[in-house]
């Protein structure tokens, strides 16, 4: 590969750290998010399982004798290893024998059936999740404001520049796909649509050889798009399909198909948080639903820029999804985790970031600057309720991430305000 053409990714540091720590690293994530490019950058030799040359001779060789494809300068890239699941055990065994660090990099766009893998690889093969590009990685955010700094309670007030609504809509429809960043928006919108087609026409059967109902899977994907950034249950998805598409799908099928989409890394849900914040008030445990990139929801909804301008409710959910995609990428780069918060008093925080030290930061996400006051008051109210508990833990900071803002600053009530287009690691 042309290393001088490589576009740096936030996960690069983690890849280097993992290679120094483990015998092998498995980089997982949705197709087309840049896994192969990043892995090739960090490797010294490569083997591509999906190469069609010679009627897929690479895959046939790996199936014949997995150990043969492991020979090469380290780190050696085994791209799309799930095409031959037995490679996992071959890598684990090779790592066990040599005890050397950084021998292999595996990439995977799907998780094969566990029955095809004899050992977990724990302690030998470390898993690293990769996602589409954040706005900072694609150059759409200046990165002047550090999320790590916010989570430690510090923010330097500064002007960040004007942002147009049309820009935010562009970022949502375009998505974080590396090959999409320099295309005109009309062309860029085609990639996530093609992604969905590839999933439906090939991947849902190829993952384990089981034939599935393509139409029902498409209905489920459309329902997930309509319910992006919400905490609806599987039954609500079933009911949504019945109400909108007038078709019946049993809940068990919904659950089975969601598992397939999860194994294809098409789903990237946000876990609930709350048990560590308070002791007596009941906290909801539903995950917030997300597709791997908000552009996929746009593709499934056939959402054009004009449609989103005229449907600010849908745009609001998609902007929230955009923010939470980026927050997860930034947070994981310094060992933090992204959650969301809902309790049975109907109090919500769009995002909660928990640092490795156990500190937490509450975040509200708002598209318009006119919503900042309400969002800040909501955060302060939740903080007040949490601290009223005997074991309530004070947040390190509270923050409103907004779309249409031109400055990062701290309000008189202590709440930070940061435009998404200024946020970075």
Predicted regions and their residues:
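Conserved lysine of the Walker
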Residues: 35
């Amino acid at each position: 590969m042309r290393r001088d053409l490589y576009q740096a990714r936030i996960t690069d540091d983690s890849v280097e750290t993992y290679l120094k720590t483990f015998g092998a690293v498995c980089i997982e994530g949705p197709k087309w998010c840049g896994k192969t490019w990043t892995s090739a950058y960090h490797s010294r030799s490569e083997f591509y399982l999906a190469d069609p040359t010679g009627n897929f001779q690479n895959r046939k060789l790996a199936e014949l004798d997995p150990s043969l494809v492991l020979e090469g300068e380290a780190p050696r890239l085994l791209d799309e290893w799930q095409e031959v699941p037995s490679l996992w055990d071959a890598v684990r065994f090779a790592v066990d024998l040599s005890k050397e660090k950084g021998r292999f990099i595996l990439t995977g766009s799907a998780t094969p059936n566990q029955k095809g893998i004899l050992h977990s690889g724990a302690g030998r093969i470390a898993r690293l999740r990769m996602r589409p590009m954040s706005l900072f990685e694609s150059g759409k955010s200046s990165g002047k404001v550090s999320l790590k700094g916010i989570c430690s309670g510090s923010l330097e007030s500064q002007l960040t520049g004007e942002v147009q609504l049309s820009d935010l809509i562009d970022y949502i429809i375009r998505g974080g796909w590396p090959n999409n960043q320099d295309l005109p928006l009309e062309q860029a919108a085609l990639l996530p649509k093609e992604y969905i087609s590839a999933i439906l026409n090939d991947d849902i059967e190829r993952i384990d050889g089981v034939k599935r109902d393509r139409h029902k899977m498409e209905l489920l994907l459309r329902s997930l798009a309509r319910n992006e950034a919400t905490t609806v249950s599987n039954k609500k998805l079933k009911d949504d399909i019945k109400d909108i598409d007038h078709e019946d799908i049993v809940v068990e099928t919904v659950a089975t198909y969601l598992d397939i989409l999860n194994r294809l890394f098409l789903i990237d849900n946000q876990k609930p948080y709350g048990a560590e914040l308070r002791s007596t008030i009941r906290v909801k445990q539903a995950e917030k639903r997300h597709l791997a990139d908000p552009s996929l929801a746009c593709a499934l909804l056939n959402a054009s820029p004009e449609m989103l301008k005229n449907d600010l409710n849908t745009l609001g959910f998609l902007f929230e999804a955009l923010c939470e995609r980026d927050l997860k990428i930034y947070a994981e780069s310094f060992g933090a985790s992204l959650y969301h918060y809902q309790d049975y008093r109907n109090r919500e925080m769009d995002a909660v970031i928990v640092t490795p030290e156990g500190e937490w930061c509450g975040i509200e996400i708002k598209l318009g600057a006119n919503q900042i006051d309400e969002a800040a008051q909501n955060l302060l109210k939740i903080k007040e309720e949490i601290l009223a508990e005997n074991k309530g833990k004070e947040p390190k900071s509270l923050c409103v991430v907004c779309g249409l803002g031109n400055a990062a600053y701290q309000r008189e009530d202590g709440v930070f305000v940061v435009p998404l287009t200024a946020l970075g690691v």
